[in-house]
């Protein structure tokens, strides 16, 4: 697939997500969380292209959190943002030391790291008056999270494309919800984004998400529709076919 075709495909699915879930309204100030990875770069690049087209009237701002991880170097990232003329701020907060101190060796850091990062993001968005917080999770993240929740937490849940935070002060959006990771990888390579690797997570083996990712990949080899069917299932729920007592009063369920 050519460079333009990949970009066109991704923009199509981002616009579909924006419209299906009314993610962005006229006049919104959208804070895009830029981690330095392929997904967040792709999200920011595509939203910027859509903004420049002019059909969607909104402003974007890139928020970068430097968590003081060893080897972090954002000089190329700064250059890329300056070149694109995208306003941004890089905030330094040492969550790395906290995670290393609290999590025993050999255990996964992702949960605590995410909680700390989320608190900082919410606080910054509120202080700066942003109406939307855009995250770079894509289709594969959503379906992997679904299986992870079932397998390891005993819950049927995932990542919604649009979410009101628990404190009801922030609206989170995931414009890449329909986009496949393989297309994002191609796009990121073509755009030559100056990626910043996450040394904290990348050094850990056998993460749950990687195992679930391999499982879905293996199933897709037998039936290519498996990933798309899983995504479709997230918006095609049949509550009467489940066994949640909060949805149905099973004890009183009888024929009239």
Swiss-Prot record:
EC number per UniProt: 2.8.1.-
Binding site for [4Fe-4S] cluster: 110, 113, 201
Main location per the UniProt record: cytoplasm
Pathway assigned in UniProt: tRNA modification
InterPro entries xref list: Rossmann-like_a/b/a_fold, TilS/TtcA_N, tRNA_Cyd_32_2_STrfase, tRNA_thiolation_TtcA_Ctu1
Compartments, record wording: Cytoplasm
Gene Ontology process terms (BP): tRNA thio-modification
Enzyme class per UniProt: transferase
GO cellular component: cytoplasm
Pfam family, any one: ATP_bind_3
Swiss-Prot/TrEMBL cofactor(s): Mg(2+); [4Fe-4S] cluster
Keyword tRNA-binding attached: yes
Its biological purpose: Catalyzes the ATP-dependent 2-thiolation of cytidine in position 32 of tRNA, to form 2-thiocytidine (s(2)C32). The sulfur atoms are provided by the cysteine/cysteine desulfurase (IscS) system.
Family: Belongs to the TtcA family.
Note: The thiolation reaction likely consists of two steps: a first activation step by ATP to form an adenylated intermediate of the target base of tRNA, and a second nucleophilic substitution step of the sulfur (S) atom supplied by the hydrosulfide attached to the Fe-S cluster.
NCBIfam families registered for this protein in UniProt: PRK10696.1
Oligomeric and partner information: Homodimer.
PANTHER family from the UniProt entry: AMINOTRAN_5 DOMAIN-CONTAINING PROTEIN, SULFURTRANSFERASE-RELATED
Protein name, entry field: tRNA-cytidine(32) 2-sulfurtransferase
Organism field: Coxiella burnetii (strain RSA 331 / Henzerling II)
Classification lineage: Bacteria, Pseudomonadati, Pseudomonadota, Gammaproteobacteria, Legionellales
Gene: ttcA
């Amino acid at each position: 697939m050519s460079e333009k075709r990949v970009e066109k495909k991704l923009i199509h699915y981002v616009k579909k997500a924006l419209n299906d879930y009314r993610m962005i309204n006229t006049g919104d100030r959208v804070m895009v969380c830029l981690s330095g990875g392929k997904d967040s770069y792709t999200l920011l690049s595509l939203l910027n292209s859509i903004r420049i087209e002019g059909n969607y009237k909104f402003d974007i701002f890139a928020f970068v959190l430097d968590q003081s991880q060893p080897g972090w170097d954002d000089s190329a990232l700064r250059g890329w943002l300056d070149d694109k003329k995208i306003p941004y701020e890089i905030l330094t907060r040492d969550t790395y030391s906290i995670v290393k101190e609290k999590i025993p060796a050999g255990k996964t850091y992702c949960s605590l790291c995410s909680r700390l990062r989320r608190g900082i993001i919410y606080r910054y968005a509120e202080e700066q008056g942003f109406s939307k917080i855009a995250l770079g999770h894509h289709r594969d993240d959503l379906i992997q999270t679904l299986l992870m929740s079932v397998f390891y937490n005993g819950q049927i849940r995932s990542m919604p494309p649009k979410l009101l935070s628990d404190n009801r002060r922030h609206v989170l959006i995931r414009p890449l919800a329909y986009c496949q990771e393989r297309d994002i990888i191609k796009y990121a390579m073509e755009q030559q984004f100056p990626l910043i690797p996450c040394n904290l997570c990348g050094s850990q083996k056998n993460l749950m998400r990687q195992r679930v990712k391999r499982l879905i990949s293996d199933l897709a080899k037998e039936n290519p529709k498996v990933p798309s069917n899983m995504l479709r299932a997230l918006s095609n729920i049949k509550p009467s076919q489940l066994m949640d007592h909060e949805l149905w009063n099973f004890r009183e369920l009888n024929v009239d």
